[in-house]
Amino acid sequence: MNQRNNLIDFSDREKFFLYDVSGLGIDLDNKFDDFGVTNILRKQTAKAASLKAKLLVGQNSPIAYEVFVEMFEFLNSPPFKMIYETDAGLYYRDCVLSKLTKGDMEKGRVFIEDIAFDFTGFYYQWKNQSYSPVENIDGNGKIYGWSVYPYNYESDINGVGGVFQIDNNSLLFGLEGSSPVEVTIKGPCENPSWEITNGSKILQSDAYNLAIDDGYKLVVSSFPGEQACKLIAPDGTSSNVYQQQDTSKTNFVSIPIGQSFFVFHNFGKNVEFKFKEYRGVT
């Protein structure tokens, strides 16, 4: 899938077909400190990985040249997401083109070329959660009649919202890391804030000193290369709100591996967020 959300199926056997595929795993770079006959792992990082394959273009098509042009147009809108589906589920992996050969048409009016993509991260699945407060209606409480003065106890419905337990089950092969997250707050509300906690400890936090009118929404993203905080109007126009970000917070939070809590304050009609749960190999 390219930046315009156009898709090419490299397994359809009609226009495009990949074979002799390699590079779907990971490659780790290990740094050791030597102590006599013992080596102690000091640092571990993931090397850049590349998908390499043979590409057959126009196998069952009478217009192989036009099919090749179709692929050129697709590749003209980077970056790309590889969509990889197995028995374990559907995963994405971000990538950029690194090689595409172009030779003469082979017998049978097909092209057989080399193609390669450099991956910019691990496989991932999207994880989404949201909460919309329920309107607190007068009279939806309970009457307890055993006291001297019967009292109508209203349930604080809104008070239970905005707290999410998160289980980030990313598999990073021992590498340190966390999952970037995109938060969306829909107005009306004032001075929204949120934090990630573990027990009583606040791990990360973010806050914005601004009013969000009805119909507007605040979108804050910590995705690498897409880090932003913007206010989006009902007509789709957006404006940066960096100046309204509370710099006393850690800002641009990410979801740690394992269990944690995502706690929101002063949100409006709806709060939602999505993050990437990573897999080194799938």
Where do the model's predicted regions map?
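Oligomerization/assembly interface segments of phage tail-like spikes and tubes
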Residues: T38-I63, R109-F122, S260
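Beta-strand elements of well-folded, non-transmembrane domains
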Residues: L55-Q59, T101, F119-Y123, G187-C189, ...
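"Short basic amphipathic alpha-helical interaction patches in structured regions
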Residues: E66-E73, V110-E113, Q129-V134
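Polar/acidic, low-complexity leader/linker segments enriched in S/T/G and N/D
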Residues: M1-D34
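Short beta-strand and beta-hairpin "edge-sheet" elements
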Residues: L18-Y19, G25-I26, K81-N128
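Short, acidic/charged, Gly/Pro-enriched secondary-structure junctions
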Residues: L7, G58-L100, F261
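Intrinsically disordered, low-complexity segments enriched in serine, threonine, and glycine
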Residues: V134-T282
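Short amphipathic beta-strand/extended segments with alternating polar/hydrophobic composition
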Residues: Y19-V21, D29-N30, Y91-S98, L203-L210, ...
